[in-house]
Each structure stands twice: as structure tokens, then as C-alpha cells.
């Protein structure tokens, strides 16, 4: 019985570790995707591809809604400061601000007004920078 408990404990630890690694890799991939979307939007503004801009805003908003779930305790990694888990409420509020700014970008794209779109992109980028200043190490 003692060996069964020990084996079960070791397996649970390994599974948790593998799960954390998966969460870390997935969140890194989503952040890279956001960067790619924002870069693409710069090109799409010049082309007048408003549907693509709106879709990009929606995609970023969808990630922002899920983002806090990808930072469970124990998923510390290079680049993520401990401040995320120390002040998780602030981290969550910054994710909400990111979501709201992304939805504003989506709405601005529907107006087809480049000025509104650029203002929305700047606001969205500001929410990214705000979070990075507080919670990203590099």
C-alpha cells in the first residue's frame, strides 16, 4: 500500500509538471500570435482590409478573456514575473482592459475610419505595454 501511494504521488507530480509545461508553451504561442496580429493590422489599415482588422481585434479579445486561466499557480517561467501570482487581481484587471481595448478595435474597424482604427490600435497596444511593465521580466 505504501508503494502504491508513493507511485501515485510521483505520477501525479509528473503529470502536474507536464501540464504546467503545456500551459506555458500554449500561452507563449498565444502571445506570439497576438504580436503577429498587431503587425498584420498595421498593413491591413493601409489596404483598407477592415474585416481582417475586426477579426484580429476579436481574436485578441478572445485570448484576453482566457489569458488568466493560462497563468495557474506553479506555471512560473522565464519572462513571467512573480508579481503575476502575488497580485493576480491586478493581472486579471489588465487582461480585462486588454479585452475591452481589443473589442473597441473590432468596433472601430467596422466604421472603416482609419483614424478611429489607429486610435484603437494605440489604446490596445497601451494595454499590452501596461501589463508588460508590471508582469514581464524582459
Model-based region annotation:
Residues 1-7:
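Bacterial N-terminal signal peptides that target proteins for export
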Residues 7-14:
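Bacterial N-terminal signal peptides
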Residues 15, 122-125:
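Processing junctions and N-termini across compartments
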Residues 15-21:
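Sec/Tat signal peptide C-region and signal peptidase I cleavage site
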Residues 21-123:
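Extracytoplasmic c-type cytochrome modules immediately beyond a signal peptide or single-pass transmembrane anchor
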Residues 124-136:
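The canonical Cys-X-X-Cys-His
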Amino acid at each position: 500500500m505504501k508503494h502504491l501511494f508513493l507511485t501515485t504521488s510521483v505520477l501525479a507530480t509528473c503529470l502536474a509538471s507536464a501540464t504546467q509545461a503545456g500551459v506555458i508553451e500554449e500561452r507563449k504561442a498565444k502571445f506570439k500570435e497576438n504580436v503577429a496580429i498587431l503587425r498584420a493590422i498595421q498593413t491591413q489599415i493601409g489596404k483598407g482590409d477592415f474585416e481582417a482588422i475586426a477579426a484580429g481585434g476579436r481574436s485578441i479579445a478572445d485570448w484576453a478573456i482566457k489569458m488568466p486561466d493560462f497563468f495557474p499557480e506553479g506555471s512560473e517561467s522565464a519572462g513571467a514575473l512573480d508579481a503575476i501570482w502575488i497580485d493576480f487581481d491586478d493581472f486579471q484587471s489588465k487582461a480585462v482592459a486588454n479585452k475591452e481595448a481589443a473589442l473597441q478595435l473590432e468596433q472601430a474597424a467596422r466604421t472603416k475610419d482609419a483614424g478611429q482604427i489607429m486610435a484603437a490600435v494605440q489604446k490596445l497596444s497601451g494595454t499590452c505595454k501596461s501589463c508588460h511593465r508590471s508582469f514581464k521580466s524582459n
